Structures are given as C-alpha cells and as structure tokens.
Amino acid sequence: MKTYRRRIREKIIQALYTIELTGADMDSASDWLITPQIAEDSGAVRFYKQVLQSIQDHKEEIDGYITKHTFNWDMSRIAIIDKNILRMALAELLYFEDIPPKVSINEAIEIAKKFNSTDKSSKFVNGILDATYNDLKSSGKIKKCGRGLINNSSRNTSRSEEKHSTEK
C-alpha cells in the first residue's frame, strides 16, 4: 500500500519536534514514529529517513537560511513546530531534485495549518519559504529537473509556477 507523503512529512515533523524537546538522537526519536503502514512501503521509509538525514547533515546551512529571512528574530523565539516545518521544506528544496518547489512549499503550509503552533503559523512559514525560495532560485542554488520543475525545458511549465513567479 502506498503511503502519502503528507503523512510521512507529518511524521518527520513529529520526529524533529521530539529531538528538539528531548535531545534524543535521530534514530531513537524517529524509529518509533514509523507506523506499520509506513514500514510496509519501502519508498516511504526511504523518503522519511532521507529527509531526516538531510536535515541532520545540513542543519547549520538550513538554519542559516531561516535566520537570514527572519529579520530581528532569534532562532530560539521561533516556535519549535514552525522551525522544523521550515527545516523540512528547505531540505526538500535544496536536496531533493525530484520534488517541485511548489509542492515542498505547499506541503509545509498545509502542515503548518494542521499543527497550528500559532494562529499565523501558516502565513509565517509561507513568507519565510517564499523569500528563501526566491533567493535560492535567483542564486542558482536550487537544481530541479523533470516535468513541472525549474530546469525543465519542455513547454509543460505549470500554470501555478508561472502565477507564483509573476506575483512577485
């Protein structure tokens, strides 16, 4: 049975939250969150572990992007849930070439709405990710290939990506 990535992303946020609150290591904090449904789907387990590992391996860099776009905010002032949603989305933007940027951003916004650490979490997450995405795109640091992605040379450019880029 195929596991939806939204559910996996929610588990990733729960693992990151556990790690931040308890100081647990990545393996012990994340293994107990893998449900039988996720465990049966090798692709789901692989995605779950790859995203967590990317965040762990590049946490300083990812946090640097968050800090850059949260003017006058200390990282410790950002709600733990929001901070980890941003980390997950930025890891996807930076290190997962097959995931369209719009998907990573939209998923982060929807998860922020669900976990709702504050009444403005989704707007905060959207603003930070949008600013960071535009920065990364203009500096050439996002490398995405394939249908509906940045470096796709075909005419199948997504209307939502065109709309997103013209709104700025």
UniProtKB/Swiss-Prot annotation:
Q: Give the record's GO CC terms.
A: cytosol
- List the Pfam families: NusB
Lineage: superkingdom: Bacteria
Q: List the disulfide bonds.
A: none
Which keywords annotate this record? Answer: RNA-binding, Transcription, Transcription antitermination, Transcription regulation
Q: Which GO terms describe its molecular function?
A: RNA binding
- Has keyword RNA-binding? yes
Which CDD domains does the entry mention? Terminator_NusB
Annotated spans, Disordered: 147-168
Kindly give the Gene3D superfamilies that the UniProt entry links to this protein. Answer: NusB-like (1.10.940.10)
Q: Which GO terms describe its biological process?
A: DNA-templated transcription termination; transcription antitermination
Recorded coiled-coil stretches? none
Basic and acidic residues bias located where?
158-168
The function of this protein is: Involved in transcription antitermination. Required for transcription of ribosomal RNA (rRNA) genes. Binds specifically to the boxA antiterminator sequence of the ribosomal RNA (rrn) operons.
- Classification via PANTHER family: ANTITERMINATION NUSB DOMAIN-CONTAINING PROTEIN, N UTILIZATION SUBSTANCE PROTEIN B-RELATED
Which HAMAP family does the UniProt entry name for this protein? NusB (MF_00073)
NCBIfam families in alphabetical order: nusB (TIGR01951)
Family, as annotated? Belongs to the NusB family.
- Full protein name: Transcription antitermination protein NusB
Q: Which organism is it from?
A: Chlorobium phaeobacteroides (strain BS1)
